[in-house]
């Protein structure tokens, strides 16, 4: 096998592996987000109501900002 053919096969295999890995990771993340959607303000309001708290917009904003700060760490 000539040297250039070996290099070409290696590069093609590498590109194919990267592309396949990207699509597998994308599919996994889409399924994960479908099963576990991120918490939004409406969900937070419902959780507070279920816990017996009266959800004010100020409390919801404080909790959302605290959750966003925690995620960025």
Curated annotation (Swiss-Prot):
GO cellular component: plasma membrane
TM stretches of this protein: 4-24
Main location, first listed in the record: membrane
Membrane topology of the entry: Single-pass membrane protein
UniProt keyword terms in alphabetical order: Cell membrane, Membrane, Transmembrane, Transmembrane helix
Compartment annotation: Cell membrane
InterPro entries, per the entry: UPF0154
Family per record: Belongs to the UPF0154 family.
Entry protein name: UPF0154 protein BcerKBAB4_3367
